[in-house]
């Protein structure tokens, strides 16, 4: 099903949904999500947002129903493996791995149990919401096991006598600890990613995708970068430049009232730590400012 408007699928609710909406708004896409609507139309671009369950997004992309989708790599790979196993279409293209939505899929066991490696899991019953990812990992390790498929509250399975171990998403490990479990093996690392359907796009739609990608890259670069400004004595300029963590040479400008000092400006992809600022001050630098960058385009 093809339309003239760019169709983008995002998760209906949750932290990933909020991050994706924020990213699109920073890219200049205006929209207003109200109530329980499935489709939201952009106010200033030919873009429609489809608000759906996260595990529906890969299928919508692979079946060509929508053009782009924001999805966690864990969900994407689980659906891809499932479709591959059943012979269904599983083609897509990855456009950009994003800098949010980070988590890991890990096997966790009883906190008092000794663990020497994957072979210790042989013959165990493992509860999970990600049976395909778990099977792929265990097959690579050559370890036989059985699956207990659960769609929620996986962490309580061992305590309830449903399983010997679990494979679940972990961010901080606090939930595992609260349920008497410990992380034993990381089997998949995940971040949010932007994917698109396979096949060609109309010229205007392809141009819009490229524009969005350029803006997204700019937003992510800006988030990782700082704008640094300071005044420096001319005779210490080279020493000061050596301390500054810029990717390119800084801009050096004369000061109107002082001939022996200059203004130094640069964009840095690294933070300027207090220790570095103190070293700069010892060399005679003053008016040191470290500012966030809202937008950036190289």
Curated annotation (Swiss-Prot):
Q: Entry's Pfam families? A: HisG, HisG_C
Q: Which GO terms describe its molecular function?
A: ATP binding; ATP phosphoribosyltransferase activity; magnesium ion binding
Alphabetized Gene3D superfamilies for the sequence: 3.30.70.120, Periplasmic binding protein-like II
One GO BP on record is:
L-histidine biosynthetic process
Q: Where in the cell is it found?
A: Cytoplasm
At the top level, the lineage of the source is Bacteria
Q: Which reaction does it catalyse?
A: 1-(5-phospho-beta-D-ribosyl)-ATP + diphosphate = 5-phospho-alpha-D-ribose 1-diphosphate + ATP
Q: Which SUPFAM superfamilies match?
A: GlnB-like (SSF54913), Periplasmic binding protein-like II (SSF53850)
List the PROSITE patterns.
ATP_P_PHORIBOSYLTR
- Entry keywords, A to Z: Amino-acid biosynthesis, ATP-binding, Cytoplasm, Glycosyltransferase, Histidine biosynthesis, Magnesium, Metal-binding, Nucleotide-binding, Transferase
Which residues, by range, are in coiled-coil regions? Answer: none
Give EC number(s), comma-separated: 2.4.2.17
How is this protein's activity controlled? Answer: Feedback inhibited by histidine.
Is Amino-acid biosynthesis set as a keyword in this record?
Answer: yes
Q: Which GO terms describe its cellular component?
A: cytoplasm
- Cofactor(s) required for function per UniProt: Mg(2+)
Query: Could you tell me which pathway this protein works in?
Result: Amino-acid biosynthesis; L-histidine biosynthesis; L-histidine from 5-phospho-alpha-D-ribose 1-diphosphate: step 1/9
Cross-referenced PANTHER family, in alphabetical order? ATP PHOSPHORIBOSYLTRANSFERASE, ATP PHOSPHORIBOSYLTRANSFERASE ATP-PRTASE
Q: What does this protein do?
A: Catalyzes the condensation of ATP and 5-phosphoribose 1-diphosphate to form N'-(5'-phosphoribosyl)-ATP (PR-ATP). Has a crucial role in the pathway because the rate of histidine biosynthesis seems to be controlled primarily by regulation of HisG enzymatic activity.
HAMAP family per UniProt: HisG_Long
What family does the entry list?
Answer: Belongs to the ATP phosphoribosyltransferase family. Long subfamily.
Query: What name goes with this protein?
Result: ATP phosphoribosyltransferase
